[in-house]
């Protein structure tokens, strides 16, 4: 009876190659499932990965089978209704109560959707795939770095898909040569001695028999050295290295005025949390400036930005003025890629909206790489949206989007930050 001993150091990941192939094959269905799932959970809840469901029809394997048409001769077993040489009429509609002219059955049967779990890393990779900071100019190589996968030699651990056959066979040859070199040397000496004895007179039969036995034992020892061992296996190693890129800063401007009810604020926070996860996942170092505003604007830290309860009236231009001041003080446009994401319900003091238009057109949009405005409201658009629509027509680096319900957040986010052509 034969025994197989699994000596692989990475045995627990033996199905990883099949999992990766499955994720690649059904990526579109998985991404759609993730897009649906993100509306049902907090975007900060990523530690547990995500349960993904795929309709069973989408993963059915194609199969060849005979159609209902054509002429075929078959021999069927007989029974009490048919005897030899009887002919059986062709069933109508395939005879199965399925598609065609047959009748449907009264009992419906089916299969549940295929459900499986993806890890946190797989979840985030799929969530932010094909997204990037728009118009990123790669000219000042300092803090910001994108991660890219590079070959990094070989490793003794890995998944079967990354195995290096040539390097593994080289190691196998080196090991077998080292382990059998002394035995092969001794074997050559014994074979030479046996040749001398066979040609000598008188014959020394006992000595010849001893040499033949010793030669047989040495050959058996050499043959027992395995052709390949887990010690020989080498896998192509890959590592994520930070690629130098330009410095970048993201300004997050959030309206916290009294017109923003709690549901609207929650949607704005969910958008900004999604933005934060995207930046921290995709780029190594990005400065983030948080600005909250009502009648007055204030630069705050991350904790206060998301959790402060302060509120008041609405003057949107206060946030734009503060952003302009911070840019002039700390972020030279010649050295920084400047981005901004503004979220508001669109309710603003009427005389202030033209001022917002002027500030953006003359001071902010000429120096930023990309400015996005998200209006979160179920009401009709007001003067601020109309002023911003005019800016969108005049500036390519300005984009506006409308969010009505929580399920709009992720599609709007992908629309704003989908990958574009990068300037060099």
Curated annotation (Swiss-Prot):
<feature type="compositionally biased region" description="Gly residues">
    <location>
        <begin position="92"/>
        <end position="105"/>
    </location>
</feature>
<protein>
    <recommendedName>
        <fullName>UPF0229 protein YPO2152/y2169/YP_1953</fullName>
    </recommendedName>
</protein>
<dbReference type="Pfam" id="PF04285">
    <property type="entry name" value="DUF444"/>
</dbReference>
<feature type="region of interest" description="Disordered">
    <location>
        <begin position="84"/>
        <end position="109"/>
    </location>
</feature>
<comment type="similarity">
    <text>Belongs to the UPF0229 family.</text>
</comment>
<dbReference type="InterPro" id="IPR006698">
    <property type="entry name" value="UPF0229"/>
</dbReference>
